[in-house]
Amino acid sequence: MSDYGFANIEEAKADAIFKLNAQYHQDEDPKKVNMSVGAYRDDTGKPWILPAVKKASKIVEEQASFNHEYLPIAGLPRFTKAAAEVLFRPNPHLLSEDRVASMQSVSGTGANFLAASFIETFYVKHTGAHVYISNPTWPVHRTLWEKLGVTVDTYPYWDAKNRSFDYEGMLSTIKSAPEGSIFLLHACAHNPTGIDPTREQWLSIFESLLSRKHLVVFDIAYQGFASGDLNRDSWALNEFVKYNKDFFVCQSFAKNMGLYGERTGCMHYVAKDASTKNKVLSQLCIVQRNTISNPPAYGARIAAEILNSPQLFAEWEQDLKTMSSRIIEMRKRLRDSLVALKTPGSWDHITQQIGMFSFTGLTPAQVQFCQERYHLYFSANGRISMAGLNNSNVEHVAQAFNHAVRELP
């Protein structure tokens, strides 16, 4: 046996979001508000099981064929096919031409891992390409690629001064990055800023990416949740299809179906032809087999039931509108409350942003002030989950922000 002692290793830092969530649950103050975790809550602050999901769960469990057997390595075919169909609704020819390789994944995180692992093996090792992620972005985007040994660079995204999208900064980096770099893009409801490019800006971004022969990976965690419209939220990646270039998409059903703990997702590779698609799919199966072997079944069965039933699909679309409209209303309430309090600065960015998160622009010191004085729990970078707001606490949150901005300008 080796004499190596594990007592000498460094203790890793706790994940910031999960640490905040734990602190919130330990806090006994009745006015505490949890705006850290990206999970939908209803207006009473409770987790919400979508009505369509409730019905689908019942159908799944009452099926005579229901069991707990292993799924195929690539996942539940009924789910992966339907997941691709809902993603590429405006481009059905992709599926009829057999150009989409779809791998069920452990939610969006697993989808990102599958894409990154494949790209590292079959692209980075041959080209030495770096991956470019937005600054800021979901923290796992960086750590996941770094753990695979890929060099991570960033492109500007958030204009802190104007609290808006840094379009020129992003475009400049795309144009100056070495030819054939990898660019990871948020398809909608950018996390954490909530700011998306306009359609005109997307088109310019795509032209620049293609002129530099960059490889594109889309991450779409909020299809339908962002605006309430499935096609609108997937517009960018479907527009990219028109350029006839291969690309990857990381898809999650955690947010838009509320299947957080079921870890239901899919990774899609869009190929130029069926032959390439089959080769890539075969290699993705090797990655899957050597990591998780095969994906979890229950959430996939629920999602498949919804996606393949016209009645449940229509109800799900209504559920999406219910969630997105409440988030939009909370944005308006928070902004209006800050304006009514005459809080210094402009707060229009709150209603200009979209999706689950808002990048408030508060400093780490102001965030800490809000936690200590008002028992608000949210990220040190000022990101809040709008789902944590409701009609009972939005005024309390506005008062905290107002006090923090005045106390610590």
Swiss-Prot record:
The keyword Transferase applies. CDD domains: AAT_like (cd00609). The modification Phosphoserine is found at residue 385. GO terms for cellular component: cytosol; nucleus. It comes from the Eukaryota. It is found in: Cytoplasm. InterPro entries: Aminotransferase_I/II_large, Asp_trans, PyrdxlP-dep_Trfase, PyrdxlP-dep_Trfase_major, PyrdxlP-dep_Trfase_small. Its EC number is 2.6.1.1. Its cofactor is pyridoxal 5'-phosphate. L-aspartate binds at residues 38, 138, 191, 383. The keyword RNA-binding does not apply. Pfam families: Aminotran_1_2. It catalyses: L-aspartate + 2-oxoglutarate = oxaloacetate + L-glutamate. Keywords: Acetylation, Aminotransferase, Cytoplasm, Phosphoprotein, Pyridoxal phosphate, Transferase. It is an enzyme of class 2 (transferase). Its main location: cytoplasm. The modification N6-(pyridoxal phosphate)lysine is found at residue 255. The modification N-acetylserine is found at residue 2. One of its GO terms (biological process) is aspartate biosynthetic process. GO terms for molecular function: L-aspartate:2-oxoglutarate aminotransferase activity; pyridoxal phosphate binding. Belongs to the class-I pyridoxal-phosphate-dependent aminotransferase family. Plays a key role in amino acid metabolism. PANTHER family: ASPARTATE AMINOTRANSFERASE, GLUTAMATE OXALOACETATE TRANSAMINASE 1, ISOFORM B. Homodimer. This is Aspartate aminotransferase, cytoplasmic. It comes from Schizosaccharomyces pombe (strain 972 / ATCC 24843) (Fission yeast).
